[in-house]
Amino acid sequence: MRFIRNVLQASLPLAALCLLTGCNTVVAGTAVRAPMTSDPTSGHCQEVPAPLMSIEQQRTSEPKLRIPQPPGWQRLRLLDSQLLRYSSRNDDLAARGFAPTAVVTLESTPGTTTDPQQLFDREKAGLSRFGATNLTTSKTTLCGYPAEIVKYTGPPMGNIPARNVTTLEVVAGFDDTTYVATLTIQSSDPDNPTYAQDAKTILTGFQILAPDAA
């Protein structure tokens, strides 16, 4: 707990905190396959073979988020908050003392006219302040919404080694609010074939849907 307090006092982003610590509280449960639906005005989400876990909404006006949960990935709740909505870890794939993690955050800003690129640039600036290096970006879409994939090296911190990190950022507007959902997955052994396949599944199958989606 002392390490967690020290990190908080250093004002690191909450998502970064979970990424650095790997979290340490596991919630038992089994993911259930959710309907493969999307906002009909914005495109279709991609289907993947892993079951989908629905991420709890904190308000009914928020978008619905769903994330694939391949075998061996366990849901964590230690740092769940208004910002950090979901995290999971796979201890079976641990390497160099670090287990791969997947973390989802959700932020919002009033209005729906914000340029998505401005929001993407803000997120990348935050990563640079956090100490990320070797950043590369590529534009994509997720469920029809503008998205960006950022790959980078996460800095070592204490006993936590440097990590290969991929972040998927998606911007979607609903009613009078713009939301930025961020999915980050990382490992200290990115060449592990099981991790590579799991990461692809999680990133490809992540969903952002309208608040009233089935």
Q: Where are the model-predicted features located?
A:
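N-terminal targeting sequences that direct proteins away from the cytosol to non-cytosolic compartments
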Residues: 2-86, 92, 160, 186-214
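Extracytoplasmic
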Residues: 60-64, 97-101, 145-147
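A short acidic-to-branched-hydrophobic micro-motif
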Residues: 88-118
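Short glycine/proline-enriched loop/turn "hinge" motifs that connect secondary-structure elements
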Residues: 93-97, 171-177
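Intrinsically disordered, low-complexity prosegments and terminal tails associated
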Residues: 97, 110, 114, 124-128, ...
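Short, well-ordered beta-strand elements
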Residues: 102, 177-188
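Beta-strand elements of well-folded, non-transmembrane domains
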Residues: 108, 156-158, 187
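Signature of long, low-cysteine stretches enriched in small and polar/charged residues
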Residues: 118-172
